[in-house]
Curated annotation (Swiss-Prot):
This is Chaperone protein DnaJ. InterPro entries: DnaJ (IPR012724), DnaJ_C (IPR002939), DnaJ_domain (IPR001623), HSP40/DnaJ_pept-bd (IPR008971), HSP_DnaJ_Cys-rich_dom (IPR001305), HSP_DnaJ_Cys-rich_dom_sf (IPR036410), J_dom_sf (IPR036869). It comes from Gloeothece citriformis (strain PCC 7424) (Cyanothece sp. (strain PCC 7424)). The lineage of its organism: Bacteria, Bacillati, Cyanobacteriota, Cyanophyceae, Oscillatoriophycideae. The gene is dnaJ. Participates actively in the response to hyperosmotic and heat shock by preventing the aggregation of stress-denatured proteins and by disaggregating proteins, also in an autonomous, DnaK-independent fashion. Unfolded proteins bind initially to DnaJ; upon interaction with the DnaJ-bound protein, DnaK hydrolyzes its bound ATP, resulting in the formation of a stable complex. GrpE releases ADP from DnaK; ATP binding to DnaK triggers the release of the substrate protein, thus completing the reaction cycle. Its cofactor is Zn(2+). The keyword Repeat applies. The J domain is necessary and sufficient to stimulate DnaK ATPase activity. Zinc center 1 plays an important role in the autonomous, DnaK-independent chaperone activity of DnaJ. Zinc center 2 is essential for interaction with DnaK and for DnaJ activity.
Length: 375
């Protein structure tokens, strides 16, 4: 009876498709019979392939999750046949590309079809307020664009291309290798046509035959309100141009936010601090404080204690994707106690201490403001 397929691949039961594929690639490379000659490696390799065969397909995975092996055993072979690898064959080409590319001998795909362009990454820095409120920003990128002279063909205008004689248009060259486990085809990219299956008669002078040119471009992008460090924005079709009529890739903009001297951010809340005098703390007052929306008046209640936190509702960061909802602005009150007072102030404070029935010493007033002042 086969073991648990999740345990065989070393993944959790809630692993996504990419995690399962990565685990399979790692284990298949390790236990492939052409690589691992240890006893039991072949059997382990078959288990790994069976596990991937079941877990890589949503339908069979769902049956396995619900009924176990009984849900997938009907009509499914217990062994693994190299000639019927399905999507696994594509992974094999990737896994063993370092060994010259190992295939199954059944694939003869041409590589002359459209190829999507690569995605690109751009790191972009915002100041604190730009991250809070968003807005439109201009960026500059360098990417590959389709050559306007040859329209992406790579051929000099008025000339064409012919089928590569080295690979007969397949874009691949193969070499059969016999092993104790059967005959395998080692596959590599054709060195003559670089995998295109065609050879250009005369290269385009503008792009050197590649069909694409490196260009610098200015773009305006919209920064949504409430972004934070690590927020990723996708700009469709602004990556590298595709090849042979393929679509362009996408541009991914990764945002970072500069620190602010006055404000700190915690989730969608903003934090700041202000200092008031001990008299303002005792008597209370009205003050103007800075917020990301501008100055705002707050009330310091009489008897406010050090480290009191005042909350300004809806003065924080807009929630990403729902800018109507905002966090709060939390203001910590620091009370400044003077280290020295002049004689007149001291006399008044001593009278206050006497009224309150509190003692004081040479080093300062004890009790209400005890031990806080020095001559």
């Amino acid at each position: 009876m086969p073991g648990d397929y999740y345990e065989i691949l070393g993944v959790s039961r809630d692993a996504n498709k990419d995690e399962i594929k990565r685990a399979y690639r790692r284990l298949a490379r390790k236990y492939h019979p052409d690589v691992n000659k240890e006893i039991g490696a072949e059997e382990r390799f078959k288990e790994i392939n069976r596990a991937y065969e079941i877990l890589s397909e949503p339908e069979t995975r769902a049956r396995y999750d619900r009924f176990g092996e009984a849900g997938v055993s009907s009509g499914a072979g217990s062994g693994f046949e190299y000639g019927d690898m399905g999507g696994i064959a594509d992974i094999f080409e990737t896994i063993f590309s370092g060994f010259g590319g190992m295939g199954t001998g059944t694939s003869s795909r041409r590589r002359t079809g459209p190829v999507r362009g690569d995605d690109l990454r751009l790191d972009f820095k915002l100041n604190f307020r730009e991250a809070v409120f968003g807005g439109e920003k201009e960026i500059r990128i360098r990417h590959l664009e389709t050559c306007q002279v040859c329209e992406g063909s790579g051929a000099k205008p008025g000339t064409g291309s012919r089928t590569c004689s080295t690979c007969s248009g397949s874009g691949q060259v193969r070499r059969a290798t016999r092993t104790p486990f059967g005959t395998f085809a080692q596959v590599s990219v054709c060195p003559t046509c670089n995998g295109s299956g065609e050879v250009i008669e005369e290269k385009c002078e503008a792009c050197g035959g590649s069909g694409r040119k490196q260009e610098t471009k200015k773009l305006k992008i919209t920064i949504p309100a409430g972004v934070d460090n690590g927020t990723r924005l996708r700009v469709s079709r602004e990556g590298d141009a595709g090849q042979r009529g393929g679509p362009p890739g996408d541009l991914y903009v990764y945002l970072s936010v500069e620190t602010d001297e006055e404000f700190q951010r915690e989730g969608i809340d903003i934090k700041s601090e202000i200092s008031i005098s001990y008299l303002q703390a005792i008597l209370g007052c009205r003050l103007s404080v800075n917020t990301v929306d501008g100055p705002e008046e707050i009330t310091i209640e009489p008897g406010t204690q050090p480290n009191t936190v005042l909350t300004l509702p809806n003065r924080g960061v807009p929630k990403l994707g729902n800018p109507v909802a905002r966090g709060d602005h939390l203001i910590t009150i620091n009370v400044s106690i003077p280290t020295r007072v002049n004689p007149e102030e001291r006399e008044l404070l001593e009278k206050l201490a006497k009224i309150r029935g509190e003692s004081h010493g040479k080093g300062g007033i004890e009790g209400f403001l005890g031990g806080l002042f020095h001559k």
